[in-house]
Amino acid sequence: MDEENMTKSEEQQPLSLQKALQQCELVQNMIDLSISNLEGLRTKCAASNDLTQKEIRTLESKLVKYFSRQLSCKKKVALQERNAELDGFPQLRHWFRIVDVRKEVLEEISPDQLSLEDLLEMTDEQVCETVEKYGANQEECARLNASLSCLRNVHKSGGNLSKQDWIIQWPTTEPGQESNPVCPPEPSPWIRTHLSQSPRVQTKCPQHFCPTSPTPGTPVYTQVDRLTVDAYPNLCPPPPPLESGHRSLPPSPRQRHVVRTPPRTPNIVTTVTPPGTPPMRRKNKLKPPGTPPPSSRKLIHLIPGFTALHRSKSHEFQLGNRVDEANTPKAKKKSKPLNLKIHSGVGSCENIPAQQRSPLLSERSLRSFFVGHGPFLPSTPPVHTEANFSANTLSVPRWSPQIPRRDLGNSIKHRFSTKYWMSQTCTVCGKGMLFGLKCKNCKLKCHNKCTKEAPPCHLLIIHRGDPARLVRTESVPCDINNPVRKPARYSDLHISQTLPKTNKINKDHIPVPYQPDSSSNPSSTTSSTPSSPAPPLPPSATPPSPLHPSPQCPRQKKNFNLPASHYYKYKQQFIFPDVVPVPETPTRAPQVILHPVTSNTILEGNPLLQIEVEPTSENEESHNEAEESEDEFEEMNLSLLSARSFPRKASQTSIFLQEWDIPFEQLEIGELIGKGRFGQVYHGRWHGEVAIRLIDIERDNEDQLKAFKREVMAYRQTRHENVVLFMGACMSPPHLAIITSLCKGRTLYSVVRDAKIVLDVNKTRQIAQEIVKGMGYLHAKGILHKDLKSKNVFYDNGKVVITDFGLFSISGVLQAGRRDDKLRIQNGWLCHLAPEIIRQLSPDTEEDKLPFSKHSDVFALGTIWYELHAREWPFKTQPAEAIIWQMGTGMKPNLSQIGMGKEISDILLFCWAFEQEERPTFTKLMDMLEKLPKRNRRLSHPGHFWKSAEL
């Protein structure tokens, strides 16, 4: 309380004119920087990207705070002490840039005619009348009023509001005009596909395809509405309001075209609703109309798309698929089917207030929602067709395969063991931890203090044939040790993957490990649950083949003798005896075809080099993905996600990246010290001298941003004396940079070519040993350099530092300056590439798709070893076409001209072996370098004369 009173008293204290000007100028510098970043995000980045939207919201709230601070500083100065310079703050032109007012309007308004303070004192109608005189349209007036309303609230509160109140609530439609979404005359192809495959789901009468008619001046926000279960089929009660935890945020001004653009998915305001059931009676009384029945947790899994009872922002668009159970009298038999009436909530016909809708549902999120729901599979709960049931009734057995049975839950205790991680997240509280506990059964990781709130262990009791006989099995598949198939964590099943931190898990929530997670196809119900065996499939249904069969499971092969037709692609829960593993087929290396250089080919623009590349097999792709994903944090199987065609984000990746994120405003960029394919390198300061590498990647490309984050994840775990020290990264587009320690000395490329420096055998061996140490460490961490050369190695007084490892994946996805029929080759790059990479070069093959491996890094080290003794690159005087042909066929330069010894040339030939399996590892290379004969001192050294005199 004392601190709050002190801050309030300081805010009320008057300021002198000089101090107020200093504070306003300081805040104005921050405003200029933030506005430039905001305009860059709005114009150069994709508006549909979630990361871009979040950054835009953050910058807008910061700017509101900055303008409020300028108003407060100006208010503390007495009126008689103010001068013209102070009256110029805050600047109206900068506020109009935030609102995205056209330049024509800005040029018409002069600072003497209108100020921001004048607009704050006006009403909305007066603001519109004033701005329309200068040529502003109604849409700009609506945005200006929304921004001024937010600034008034923040300024009146003195900045004590929450961060959510700083966000400007932008309107999405022009005031004064009615926005009636276009209603299609018939359902979309997506809906027709689902209706044709579901026998009892029919479209309603055309009057339900009615558009919403908002009142003039009210912004219309579209959202996928909820489903309700009603006792009367003709009533459309308004949906309940959203909880306070889900705050609706309208889009930014630059993102309004996304809302207006008609999506390729079905229109949001289209309603497809199965007809309702007859009114239900309970105790001879009808339920009052318009009263929604209470929800039931047991029936929530009947609807495709719901897997567990969790609440997260990433599943907010699935609120339209909720089904509530009516209060029916208790049945004597549990097998009696339940009658449900399902109201489709995709654009309900009633008028919903704007504050209850969420306009941030972009076209991409809606498209993923519709595409993710595939057609109803034959294993959907059967629909009864008896005469006593209405044609508009959907009957579902009580024990559907999608319903978890609570009576089979148990309270098995965890088998915890103490563990240590470099960086890990607690499953219960969502906070980071170094020391903690890990369950041996379900692999749950949490703090010691969180064990009391941890959910029960993931063990289930499964009925098998005779209900009296129970078989206990673990929830993880038997091939858990397979590096390609990693077990799913508890957070993957029940916690949203898009949130960096999650709240504590509800104790009453029963974990359902066998239910499909949020990334699986929600409309498929073919995965068998412990409560019921898999339903039989009709002969016409052709199930997909298993992804990764593992026949080495004797226990599960004995317990589960299910046909292979029920094996689906959710999770490998059961192993079936009739699944035969697919043998691996060796791939054939492509052939290099070198066309003769003629004038015709050059004039026609045809490529001088043509390389036939065969696609790699799926086994190699999965093996490469397994190597990349071997990190401290556990990820979902990448091959399984690609088979599902459903995007997914790892929650812990964002948490790890936050630890190394450095705001771009904190960096002091100095002079340019280097430039390469990855961008420019500047000498800068961030708590000392650092090297700032600005990554020059294309904008509006998710693949490049993901590749950059993957390399940052690889950088963060490197700590070695021969590897450059990673200090952090700027990961807020459009500013992407990697901050490392400043390397002293010169590059090995310049040292080798300096004739004044003597490189004898002892010095070259010492340099090579330092490089081998650093590369061996990177390979032990699972990191490939992919661009090892003398220009990426720094040498200073016998110390070697390796830089730029892993950045080749970022440069590989660059398309700037790339031509369709040209292969970009930098000087000195080809002699560092292994033959298997040379043979894959093609104008059509992207650089990040080249088959880099640990063996290719060893080949590049051989080129550096050659350069240390020859003081030049191999094949330097030859053209690129000749180098590609010679190195692709395994030819080597003439070593007799250099005068290498036998031991030195043997190391070079081992590194340059044509077959990559014959190349040694860096551990073996260290042994070979240590066995090199050391050069003794000359006999004319004074030490020898001293020894001879003693004799």
Curated annotation (Swiss-Prot):
Residues the entry annotates as binding ATP: 673-681, 789, 804
Residues with the modification Phosphoserine, per the entry, are 475
Q: Where in the sequence is the signal peptide annotated?
A: none
Cellular compartment(s)? Cytoplasm; Membrane
Bias (Pro residues) ranges: 532-552
Name the Gene Ontology molecular function terms of this record.
Answer: ATP binding; MAP-kinase scaffold activity; mitogen-activated protein kinase kinase binding; protein serine kinase activity; protein serine/threonine kinase activity; zinc ion binding
Where do the segments described as Disordered lie?
237-298, 489-559, 614-634
User: GO biological process annotations for this chain's record?
Assistant: calcium-mediated signaling; positive regulation of cold-induced thermogenesis; positive regulation of MAPK cascade
Provide the topology term for how it sits in the membrane: Peripheral membrane protein
Designated name of the protein = Kinase suppressor of Ras 2
Q: Which organism is it from?
A: Mus musculus
The gene name reads Ksr2
